Amino acid sequence: MTKQVEIFTDGSCLGNPGPGGYGIVLRYRKVEKTLAEGFTLTTNNRMEMLAAVVALQALKEPCSVILTTDSQYVRQGITQWIHNWKKRDWKTADKKPVKNADLWQRLDKETARHSVDWRWVKGHAGHRENEMCDDLARSAAENPTQEDTGYQPS
């Protein structure tokens, strides 16, 4: 039987672009695990996306996942926009390269391994797990240790 896992993610950026981080809460049954990492120069959208990628990568086997994010960019991108981007070879409707295509491709690959139900929650509205992720992401952004090698300044 497929394991049922809940994932909560958030990204943070101190300045946009600037130092950033992600925070993740993974829950299987009643056990919670948190993950966080900080990056020296990135954007808020990249951190929101990377949180989802890393969370799904952390699952050792295909799972049934409820993934909750406060990012409409991530939720709409992976459930709606990505289909046309792939058809157009990672170009937007006006033939421009899709921003953050490296992370969209990674997220698409990880999503294919699992059955993912994407949920949205309003950020900074008292949602327990979202607040936990926000705290983790902000702390990671304040102490960045990694380089976001895929970040490309516009």
Swiss-Prot record:
- Which GO BP terms, alphabetically? DNA replication, removal of RNA primer
Q: Which gene encodes it?
A: rnhA
Cite the cofactor comment. Binds 1 Mg(2+) ion per subunit. May bind a second metal ion at a regulatory site, or after substrate binding.
GO MF term list: magnesium ion binding; nucleic acid binding; RNA-DNA hybrid ribonuclease activity
What protein does this entry describe? Answer: Ribonuclease H
Write out the function statement from the record: Endonuclease that specifically degrades the RNA of RNA-DNA hybrids.
Binding, Mg(2+) 2: 10, 134
- Record's HAMAP family? RNase_H
Lineage from the top down? Bacteria, Pseudomonadati, Pseudomonadota, Gammaproteobacteria, Vibrionales
User: Which Pfam family, just one, is annotated for this protein?
Assistant: RNase_H
Q: Which PROSITE patterns match?
A: RNASE_H_1
Any idea which UniProt keywords this protein has? Cytoplasm, Endonuclease, Hydrolase, Magnesium, Metal-binding, Nuclease
Q: Which GO terms describe its cellular component?
A: cytoplasm
List, separated by semicolons, the cofactors it needs.
Answer: Mg(2+)
What are the binding positions for Mg(2+) 1 in this chain? Answer: 10, 48, 70
Q: What class of enzyme is it?
A: hydrolase
Subunit and interaction comment = Monomer.
Subcellular location(s): the record lists: Cytoplasm
Task: Please give the organism.
Answer: Vibrio atlanticus (strain LGP32) (Vibrio splendidus (strain Mel32))
